[in-house]
Amino acid sequence: MARYLGPKAKLSRREGTDLFLKSARRAISDKAKFDSKPGQHGRTSGTRTSDFGLQLREKQKVKRMYGVLEKQFRRYFEEADRRKGNTGANLLFILESRLDNVVYRMGFGSTRAEARQLVSHKAITVNGNSVNIPSYMVKTGDVIAVRDKSKKQTRVTEALELAKQVGLPAWVDVNADKGEGVFKKVPDRDEFAADVNESLIVELYSR
């Protein structure tokens, strides 16, 4: 299955929430109206979505948010289920540990898609070694850096400037001048993705 290359705001409207796919970290109201689904008439009133429909929608939302396709998402779920603790939370921890997501969280890319491009184009190093695999799992203490020749790219400097304005999450420590950061820890569940109900995804895969 190929990645979706159409309008990004349309996906956010379909899920009813900002997936942070389009441009950097602007407010939802600045991007599009997410209270109606795409299409001529938008959301149909008076209809009730089935439990299965709600579960499927939540899975689609998280897949699109992190830019992961079904086969890989299923593997992540199976890994999360094998780990100790809450399966749903474990799934989100795995997604948050992807290199492309960490690059995004550190402010080197204004969207996860842009961060994924930086990784794929060999603009990112992990502990001094070039890594061009977006799904690479970052570990606590890993140092993520933008390679010297890429630091002055407009998209990188603009993303860092924006990150400076809106702030960075507590689980990363970034030196913007050096273009590098440390992944301090896997975030606690209450530190991110407040609008995600991962239990629905667990219910879906447990059918």
Curated annotation (Swiss-Prot):
Region Disordered: start-end pairs: 31-53
Annotated GO CC locations: small ribosomal subunit
Pfam families (UniProt xref): Ribosomal_S4, S4
Gene3D superfamilies: Ribosomal Protein S4 Delta 41, Chain A, domain 1, RNA-binding S4 domain
Stretches assigned to the S4 RNA-binding domain: 97-158
A Gene Ontology BP annotation from the UniProt entry: translation
Annotated SUPFAM superfamilies: Alpha-L RNA-binding motif
GO molecular function: rRNA binding; structural constituent of ribosome
Mitochondrion is among the record's keywords: no
Keywords attached to this entry: Ribonucleoprotein, Ribosomal protein, RNA-binding, rRNA-binding
Domain of life: Bacteria
Composition bias type Polar residues, residue spans: 42-52
Function: One of the primary rRNA binding proteins, it binds directly to 16S rRNA where it nucleates assembly of the body of the 30S subunit.
Family: Belongs to the universal ribosomal protein uS4 family.
Record note on quaternary structure: Part of the 30S ribosomal subunit. Contacts protein S5. The interaction surface between S4 and S5 is involved in control of translational fidelity.
Full protein name: Small ribosomal subunit protein uS4
Species annotation: Polaromonas sp. (strain JS666 / ATCC BAA-500)
Lineage of the species this protein comes from: Bacteria, Pseudomonadati, Pseudomonadota, Betaproteobacteria, Burkholderiales
